[in-house]
Regions:
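Functionally important transmembrane alpha-helices
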Residues: 172-179, 192-250
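Alpha-helical transmembrane segments in multi-pass membrane proteins
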Residues: 20-81
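Hydrophobic alpha-helical transmembrane segments
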Residues: 19-23, 62, 99-104, 139-143, ...
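Hydrophobic core segments of transmembrane alpha-helices in multi-pass, intramembrane catalytic enzymes
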Residues: 67-72, 141-145, 199-204
Length: 250
């Protein structure tokens, strides 16, 4: 009970619920990718292999968008139907009155970490770069990055995972572990290079501290949107509105 009092967190769900949520998320993403790859091969790309279609960035973004929507429904059902709680109250949504401040904070975080990244070994070619081969791919990732991605990632890491860890392990360790998990899931798209993964880990620290201090998942989402939106805006500007994406590789 003392751990609950110190952290101020006492979610109705358990660590096992969060573990199952993680498995459901991974399974749903995999299923959507496989299903859309199969459908695309049958309907659109008869001459391409299943593996080549599955690697298409646009298909990946669409599949993840569908999967994230399904995961959001699962989250709501878990809280409302299983635990009979109001979803917004249970995850501590708590929309802030001065919400633009948090978007601006995310923008400042992005600019600061862009400067910090100049002192780190950042690979010139990473898997995420494949999402900027065509304007359609760039736009799809940009839209996803300021809508479903921050919503679902913040709900999972700061809405579901963090309070369980804080109740069990305390605030400080929960912040570190939540940020580590956040960095881990972004590792593959960054080629698992320690420089960019460290940057994402720091972002995770900032987002989790925001959640811990404000007691609001919504504030973390706003900071996340500000961060992703600023990076997308910089890429948009550097590529002349995504019309000259080759400039991003020079």
């Amino acid at each position: 009970m003392s751990r609950v009092n110190r952290s101020g967190e006492n979610p109705v769900w358990t660590g096992w619920d969060v573990a199952l949520l993680a498995l459901v998320t991974l399974g749903t993403i995999l299923f959507c990718i496989l299903f859309l790859t199969f459908a695309a091969q049958k309907l659109l790309f008869h001459n391409l292999s299943f593996a080549d279609i599955g690697k298409m960035p646009l298909l990946s973004v669409i599949a993840q968008g569908i999967a994230y929507t399904a995961v959001l429904i699962y989250m709501i059902v878990l809280v409302v139907a299983v635990y009979h709680q109001n979803f917004e109250s249970a995850v501590r949504w708590n929309w802030p009155r001065r919400w633009p401040i948090f978007i601006a904070g995310g923008a400042l975080l992005a600019m600061a970490l862009q400067g910090f990244a100049h002192f780190l070994p950042i690979p010139t070619d990473m898997p995420i770069d494949e999402f900027f081969n065509t304007p359609a791919e760039a736009w799809s990732l940009t839209i996803f990055g300021v809508t479903l991605a921050p919503l679902i990632e913040e709900l999972f890491f700061r809405g579901f995972l963090y309070p369980v860890l804080a109740r069990r392990l305390g605030v400080v360790l929960a912040i570190i572990l939540t940020a580590a998990g956040f960095g881990l899931i972004h590792g593959p798209q960054l080629g698992r290079a320690w420089g960019p993964v460290l940057v994402i880990f720091i972002v995770g620290i900032a987002l989790t501290v925001t959640r811990a201090v404000t007691k609001s998942v919504a504030t973390g989402i706003l900071v996340h949107i500000g961060y992703n939106g600023t990076l997308s805006a910089l890429l948009f500007w550097a590529s002349d509105g995504f019309r000259h994406l080759e400039r991003l590789r020079t």
